[in-house]
């Protein structure tokens, strides 16, 4: 039995979302239908609102509905320390720790020549312009510990060191609750190299 065209269209659009396959898209479509027109309207309104109201912060390039964003506008945040992250989810992860009191800069990706992502596709130019306007004392590079993240960290270091700014990299190592015997060699080596006195 074929589904009605509007349902098939909704399933097709939902399946375009990252991590959503056809079966999950189908379940979501039927959930939306079952929830009724009120829910569907609220969902459509929320999607339209995000597209209409969310933009990039002119300072840190995060997604926000206010410019500057809440972090950049907060006078209690230390503007001398900037944590550079690949994406907004990374910024949110750092914020959840409640340990970082500086500000952020979101690159919106990582260098990946094989995928056609070079420096001009990232928000690196905006970072350099920001540092011209308001010099920082330290840049914390918090890109992911993968090939693209490491390449991005190295590229940023080469750009930023000549500016006289201290460039640091987040530590990497064994996750809390992890077993040493299951750690890969690179992770274990970095954990040993990054050890600190107790």
UniProtKB/Swiss-Prot annotation:
It comes from the Bacteria. Pfam families: RecR_C (PF21175), RecR_HhH (PF21176), RecR_ZnF (PF02132), Toprim_4 (PF13662). The keyword Metal-binding applies. One of its GO terms (biological process) is DNA recombination. Residues 80-175 form the Toprim domain. InterPro entries: DNA_Rcmb_RecR (IPR000093), Hlx-hairpin-Hlx_DNA-bd_motif (IPR003583), Rcmb_RecR (IPR023627), Rcmb_RecR_Znf (IPR015967), TOPRIM_dom (IPR006171), TOPRIM_RecR (IPR034137). A zinc finger (C4-type) spans 57-72. Keywords: DNA damage, DNA recombination, DNA repair, Metal-binding, Zinc, Zinc-finger. PROSITE patterns: RECR, TOPRIM. GO terms for molecular function: DNA binding; zinc ion binding. CDD domains: TOPRIM_recR. PANTHER family: RECOMBINATION PROTEIN RECR (PTHR30446:SF0). May play a role in DNA repair. It seems to be involved in an RecBC-independent recombinational process of DNA repair. It may act with RecF and RecO. Belongs to the RecR family. NCBIfam families: recR (TIGR00615). This is Recombination protein RecR. The gene is recR.
